[in-house]
From Swiss-Prot:
The keyword Hydrolase does not apply. Its EC number is 2.7.4.25. It is found in: Cytoplasm. ATP binds at residues 12-20. GO terms for biological process: pyrimidine nucleotide metabolic process. GO terms for cellular component: cytoplasm. InterPro entries: Cytidylate_kin, Cytidylate_kinase_dom, P-loop_NTPase. This is Cytidylate kinase. Belongs to the cytidylate kinase family. Type 1 subfamily. Keywords: ATP-binding, Cytoplasm, Kinase, Nucleotide-binding, Transferase. It comes from Vibrio atlanticus (strain LGP32) (Vibrio splendidus (strain Mel32)). It catalyses: CMP + ATP = CDP + ADP; dCMP + ATP = dCDP + ADP. GO terms for molecular function: ATP binding; CMP kinase activity; dCMP kinase activity. Pfam families: Cytidylate_kin (PF02224).
Amino acid sequence: MPSQSPVITVDGPSGAGKGTLCMLLADKLGFHLLDSGAIYRVLALAAIHHGVDTESEDALVPLATHLDVQFIAEGELVKVILEGEDVSGELRKEETGMAASKVAALPRVREALLRRQRAFSAAPGLVADGRDMGTVVFVEAEAKIFLDASAEERASRRLKQLQQKGLDVKFDDLLSEIQERDDRDRNRPVAPLRPAEDALVLDSTSMNIEQVVEKALHYIESKLAG
C-alpha cells in the first residue's frame, strides 16, 4: 500500500540544480518542501531574533527541536517562513551566515536538527533537498534522486548567474572553488556526499531544467505507483 506521506529526496553537489528541481517538484506534486541547506541559517536567525548565544549548545538544542519554519515553493522561488514571518532576505545576510557556521559545528545541535528535519515528513508528501537526505536523513524514502553535473558545467552556470548580477568573476576561479568544495564534501568523515545505493542518478550536464523535471517526475511516479 502506498505511503500516505511519501518522501522524495534530491541530493547532489553544489550547483547541480537541486534547489530549482526540488521547488518545481514540490510545486507540481503539491508536496511540502525541505531545504536542508538553509536549515542552519534558519536556526541561526531564530537564535539572533531570540537573543540566544549561537555558541551555546544548551540554549540552541531546544530552539532547534521546536524550530517553527516552513519552506514554501512558488514556481522557481522558495519562501522561508520563520515563526510566521518571511525571512528569505535575512537568510542571505553575512551575519546570518557567520552565525550558521558556529551553529553547524555543535554536535548536539546537529542531532536536534536531524530530528527536526525528519519531522517535515507529513501528508501529502515531502521533497527534501540536500547532500545527505537519501543516505542519512531519510534512508527509507520512497524515491531518491542524485542530481549531478560536471564541475565545468556547474561553474559555467554559476558564471552566468553572477554576470547577470553585474559581478566580474573568472570561470577558472569558480571552477577551482567548485572542485575544492566537491573534494571536501565527498571526503568528509561524517555523511560524505555520495548517491544512495537505491537512488536514480541524473546527470544534468547536457539537460535543461524541463528535461530534468520530466525524468524526475517519471521516476517518482513509477516508484510511488509501487
